[in-house]
């Protein structure tokens, strides 16, 4: 059962914490953003790539200390299908590092998350 794996990982690491991944492009270090923008231009693909690279670095730093991550779907959806792909790749990467993943996809959430959901479905993408 899934929660048995989580409990086992908590016991192994002696840590019941979960790291939330609520990425916004402005949270990503500038050097990572710059590398993605050079590679893909100022596009949603570049934004999603920068977030993925940052997530991988976070996961690498945390996987031996924190048993689980909780990516918030709204923050990935803000970057179109490329962001949703980044969510899937983040999940796979965390799992490959032995982390338990709890995707937070509830639609009735706090203000910041509701803003992220609203941003995910704009007339045009202006948040790059």
Where are the language model's segments positioned?
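Conserved small/polar residues in nucleotide/adenosyl-binding loops
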Residues: 126-127
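Active-site beta-loop-alpha junctions enriched in small/polar residues
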Residues: 22-26, 74-76, 106-110
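Glycine-rich, proline-tolerant flexible connector loops at the mouths of alpha/beta enzymes
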Residues: 72-82
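Alpha-helix-loop-beta-strand connector modules within alpha/beta enzyme cores
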Residues: 84-101
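Glycine/small-residue-rich loop that forms an oxyanion/phosphate-binding "nest" at active or ligand-binding sites
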Residues: 108-122
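Hydrophobic faces of well-ordered beta-strands that scaffold small-molecule active sites
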Residues: 17-21, 69-71, 101-103
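N-terminal glycine-rich anion-binding loop in soluble enzyme alpha/beta folds
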Residues: 1-61
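Short, well-ordered coil/turn segments that N-cap beta-strands
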Residues: 13-17, 65-67, 97-99
């Amino acid at each position: 059962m899934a929660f048995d794996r989580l409990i086992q990982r908590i016991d192994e690491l002696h840590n019941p914490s979960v790291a939330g991944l609520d990425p916004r492009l402005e949270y990503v270090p500038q050097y990572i953003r710059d590398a993605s923008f050079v590679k893909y231009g100022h596009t949603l693909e570049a934004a999603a790539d920068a977030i993925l690279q940052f997530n991988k670095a976070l996961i690498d730093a945390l996987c031996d200390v924190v048993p689980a991550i909780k990516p918030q779907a709204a923050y990935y959806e803000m970057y179109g299908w490329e962001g949703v792909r980044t969510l899937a790749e983040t999940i796979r990467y965390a799992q490959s590092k032995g982390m338990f993943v709890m995707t937070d996809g509830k639609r009735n959430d706090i203000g910041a998350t509701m803003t992220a959901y609203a941003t995910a479905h704009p007339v045009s993408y202006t948040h790059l």
